[in-house]
Amino acid sequence: MTNMRKSHPLIKIINHSFIDLPAPSNISAWWNFGSLLGVCLTLQIITGLFLAMHYTADTTTAFSSVTHICRDVNYGWLIRYTXANGASMFFILLYFHIGRGIYYGSYTFMETWNIGVLLLLLVMATAFMGYVLPWGQMSFWGATVITNLLSAIPYIGFTLVEWIWGGFSVDKATLTRFFALHFILPFIITATAAIHLLFLHETGSNNPSGLNSDSDKIPFHPYYTIKDILGLLIMLMVLLTLILFSPDLLGDPDNYTPANPLNTPPHIKPEWYFLFAYAILRSIPNKLGGVLALAFSIVILALFPALHMSKQRSMSFRPMSQCLLWALVANLIILTWIGGQPVEHPFIMIGQLASISYFCIILILMPTTSLMENKMLKW
């Protein structure tokens, strides 16, 4: 009699994905982030579901309902802060996951990579709409500023903005639709992540050497299940430390003031994980130019397969490219810092220089360095 896990139509899928999956024997801890993102997404859906049971998507009661969740619902504060800080954790893991993909040349799996870029955009949209829901000052003004960017689109811009708002300003209709979309998007993300995994399993995982590992595979379970559980415990420890000791560390104090359309906060800024893109947006004096730079700063990830000029897949044996990648990481940290600063000297200049160098590193320096490394190795 065959093992049920190998014959049952449903269990067979799980078996081929997480148990008997042949995995390279040399993948490092950098390959843990995919499973951690899956856990994070599950956590977000569960906490979000419980929050939705108590939240009201109405401008007059939204802020009070969040207060009610924190004060009156059993462990409501825990659920609320897990959903808020879980989003931050999600982005930390996501940025590590993307960085790993760039370092080890995983973007050469075109379908997997492009679906990954789509996933990033979906997660960003979900996080943005979630930030609007508590209906604090930063929620309201963040929604106003970011949706208003679409008015830079020629001809249809203003119509599009009013269509998204459901009126002539960010109001009840906007909040209701943002809540509906914020609820449905994580399920769309789950389905997209399943497709992401499907395409990955067509080719098998990449590995630190960037070489074909078909001749040296080991079963996913128990080797990588145990390894992933270690990563999971570390992640949960970091997340719980954040939630239980400083839940508002990554938030904005302005969001504890109910939304007031008549009073603009002194510094409107998004959550920390969008600050790098926000800095690029602000560094260009022209509105349409800024919006295009903002969009391109994220969509540029889709160009990585086309910009890969090296004869080697991974950066493991390419020290010059490694230096450039770390320069890019430092550059993104500078952009994140600048995004949270007021628009004044010297921050404007630093932001503009960091924005230029961001695009230069990716579009010019990295491909050129790859070609140079090929030459040095006489390839």
Swiss-Prot record:
Its required cofactor(s), as named, are: heme b
Q: Which CDD domains match?
A: cytochrome_b_C, Cytochrome_b_N
Cross-referenced Pfam families:
Cytochrom_B_C (PF00032), Cytochrome_B (PF00033)
Q: Name one GO cellular component term.
A: mitochondrial inner membrane
Q: Which family does it belong to?
A: Belongs to the cytochrome b family.
Q: Which residues bind heme b b566?
A: H97, H196
Q: Which GO terms describe its biological process?
A: mitochondrial electron transport, ubiquinol to cytochrome c
Q: What is this protein called?
A: Cytochrome b
Q: Enumerate the subcellular locations listed in this protein's record, separating them with semicolons.
A: Mitochondrion inner membrane
Q: Identify the residues that bind a ubiquinone.
A: H201
Give the species this sequence originates from.
Trinomys iheringi
What residue ranges are annotated as transmembrane?
33-53, 77-98, 113-133, 178-198, 226-246, 288-308, 320-340, 347-367
Q: What does this protein do?
A: Component of the ubiquinol-cytochrome c reductase complex (complex III or cytochrome b-c1 complex) that is part of the mitochondrial respiratory chain. The b-c1 complex mediates electron transfer from ubiquinol to cytochrome c. Contributes to the generation of a proton gradient across the mitochondrial membrane that is then used for ATP synthesis.
Q: How does it sit in the membrane?
A: Multi-pass membrane protein
List the InterPro entries: Cyt_b/b6_C, Cyt_b/b6_C_sf, Cyt_b/b6_N, Cytb/b6-like_sf, Cytochrome_b, Cytochrome_b_C_euk/bac, Cytochrome_b_N_euk/bac, Di-haem_cyt_TM
Which keywords has UniProt assigned to this entry? Electron transport, Heme, Iron, Membrane, Metal-binding, Mitochondrion, Mitochondrion inner membrane, Respiratory chain, Transmembrane, Transmembrane helix, Transport, Ubiquinone
- Describe its partners and assembly state: The cytochrome bc1 complex contains 11 subunits: 3 respiratory subunits (MT-CYB, CYC1 and UQCRFS1), 2 core proteins (UQCRC1 and UQCRC2) and 6 low-molecular weight proteins (UQCRH/QCR6, UQCRB/QCR7, UQCRQ/QCR8, UQCR10/QCR9, UQCR11/QCR10 and a cleavage product of UQCRFS1). This cytochrome bc1 complex then forms a dimer.
Q: Where does heme b b562 bind?
A: X83, H182
State which gene encodes it: MT-CYB
Q: Give GO MF terms, alphabetically.
A: metal ion binding; ubiquinol-cytochrome-c reductase activity
User: Which branch of life, at top level?
Assistant: Eukaryota
The record's listing under PROSITE patterns reads: CYTB_CTER (PS51003), CYTB_NTER (PS51002)
Q: In the record's cofactor note, how is the cofactor described as bound?
A: Binds 2 heme b groups non-covalently.
Report the principal subcellular site.
mitochondrion
Misc note: Heme 1 (or BL or b562) is low-potential and absorbs at about 562 nm, and heme 2 (or BH or b566) is high-potential and absorbs at about 566 nm.
